Regions:
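Conserved catalytic alpha/beta core of Sir2/sirtuin-type deacylases, generalized to analogous enzyme cores
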Residues: 4-207
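Short acidic, glycine-rich surface-loop motifs adjacent to enzyme active sites
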Residues: 1
């Protein structure tokens, strides 16, 4: 929800000014910054969302809108713009026998330049693009609980991809333990996007 609320308008500048050195976020917040970047004009705003009836909610669902409070994400339209490019990156990793973290695949996607023709906001307002340009570490535990994670799993079920090309949450945990020991002094800018696992995960590692 934070990415959908356009957190990037403030966070991207913080990243560019080196105020943030590592991030943790949910899989949804990782991908929703990209969705907003490439499909912003197709979002639907619902300032009176508290007055929605069950039939109103059903209509949104049938029109492929995913409501996050007062904002509806056109997930199908947004994902359609990135799917082929992301699938190509996954397939390339498989063919080369390489493995990456979920955020690293998104970095490859953004830095390839293939999405630039779809940009519907000023790219300086994308926090993920700013992080990609700085190559900041991003912890994305439970990434499979996201649209991109679901699609990746579907390709694995079909046999076109293999789960092993995406590094796991355990590997994120080990990475953070090593990174924290190397970088904790004299202090770091650690930024959390989203609740639940995005906050619990790093707290489990630090002690």
């Amino acid at each position: 929800a934070m990415s959908t609320a356009e957190l990037g308008k403030s966070l991207a500048e913080m990243i560019r000014k080196d105020k943030v050195h590592i991030l943790t976020c949910t899989g949804a917040n990782l991908e929703e910054d990209v969705f907003n970047l490439v499909a912003h004009n197709q979002y639907k705003r619902l300032p009176n969302y508290r007055d929605l009836s069950p039939s109103d909610e059903l209509e949104l669902l049938n029109n492929h809108f995913n409501r996050v409070t007062d904002t509806c994400i056109p997930e199908e339209a947004a994902f359609r713009r990135i799917e082929d490019h992301l699938l190509h990156i996954w397939e390339k990793a498989k063919s080369e026998g390489k493995r990456y973290f979920p955020h690293e695949y998104m970095y490859q996607l953004l830095l390839s330049g293939n999405l630039e023709k779809f940009y519907e906001i000023d790219p300086k307002d994308s926090w993920l693009l700013a992080a990609a340009e700085k190559d900041l570490p991003i912890l994305v535990p439970g990434w499979e609980d996201s649209t991109c994670g679901n699609i990746f799993a579907a390709h694995c079920i079909e046999g076109t991809l293999h789960p092993s090309i995406t590094k796991s949450g355990i590997e994120y945990m080990i990475y953070l333990a090593d990174w924290y020991r190397d970088n904790a002094d004299p202090g770091i800018g650690f930024f959390q996007i989203g609740g639940g696992i995005a906050g619990d995960f790093p707290i489990c590692v630090v002690p």
